[in-house]
Amino acid sequence: MLDLTRLLPGPAAALRLAELGADVLKIEAPGAGDPTRTMMQSSSDRVAGRPGAFYRMVNRGKRETRLDLKSEAGRNVLRALAAEADVLIESFRPGVMERLGLGYATLSAANPRLVYCAISGYGASGPFADHAGHDLNYIGYAGVLDQLASRDGAPIVPNFQIADLLGGALSAVTQILAALWHVARGGAGRFVDVSMTHTSYAHNFVAQVSLLNEGAAPAAGSGLLNGGVPCYNLYRTSDERWLAVGALELKFWETLCMALDRPEWATRHWSLGQAIGGPDALALIRELAEVIATRTLGEWVESLESLDCCVSPVLTPAEAAQHPLFNPHAYAAVAASAADSDDDGA
């Protein structure tokens, strides 16, 4: 597999395929190479002259080489590599590879089984095909960012790149695997066109259901899954931490109400007619918030985590990294491997 991508979406897609067993060759331009080499780079990495953790994390498990695709010699090398490859993935702006003489039509003529994946912000064709953008722009156009708003209506800047990772990386992985299966069954290769904006839009199911049913997506704090019911909400604890209550189904809500010694709350549930975002729902949110505010996060976790009621702590990334759920020893080994990899590949 040839990985010509940079930044996050393409490298993450290639990483996931490498984890599944693909032999990935990362190809970078001479000089600075992939911008993530220095993006969020620590001072110790700069002093040591090695790429930052971001680069090492999303490019681990790959071989690496440099090619100048602006030179005929570099393009000839890539053509030779593509003639033997199963997959090529790139994230240039649409049209760049064609202008270099390295587009799908050219490369597939020499290798009809080639699966060629192009990840872009707005797709290989259409009115925005040549527009620049990043994750925030893509989820903005897709109607996703609007749904990540606080109660005052102000959208947040999420530190989880939804379009890059869901719209770009995971969509690329699934489509590449489907294309490879087609080839394995005797079919020809495929051009896989991944638009991060369109794939993000396609996954915005809940908002689109409300749009169909009611003519508008729910404002923050007014829908079933965005804070409009007490059984599916976030609550502040006495130590200024947060508890996630996901007791969406009645049986989980009933268990939670009994654990809180509030059995009378069990009938105040959306499935029993409580209006979502209505007066009773908002009142019960306030009542439950008062109860949760009486104890620390640790105390709530100790008393509720073992119960079958879908309640969990809101952990920081540092806490999550040490949680038994994620097998910290295995993750530490991965991190150590990334830290030990040098500039010549992982």
Regions found by a protein language model. Give the residues of each.
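Conserved Rossmann-fold dehydrogenase catalytic segment
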Residues: A124, G153-I162, A184-S200, A216, ...
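Aromatic-enriched alpha-helical interface/lid elements that frame and gate functional surfaces
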Residues: C231-L307, V311
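Short, well-structured beta-strand/strand-turn elements
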Residues: D23-I27, E305-E319
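Terminal low-complexity tails and localization/encapsulation signals of metabolic enzymes
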Residues: A219, R236-S238, L315-A346
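Glycine-rich beta-alpha junction loops
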Residues: G31, G121-G123, M196-Y201, D239-R241, ...
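Short Pro/Gly-enriched beta-strand edge/turn motifs at strand-loop
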Residues: R37-S42, N213-A220
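Oxidoreductase and adenylate-handling cofactor-binding alpha/beta cores
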Residues: A142, G168-G189, A202, V206-E214, ...
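N-terminal helix-loop segment corresponding to the beta1-alpha1 unit
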Residues: M1-R185, E287, V334-A335
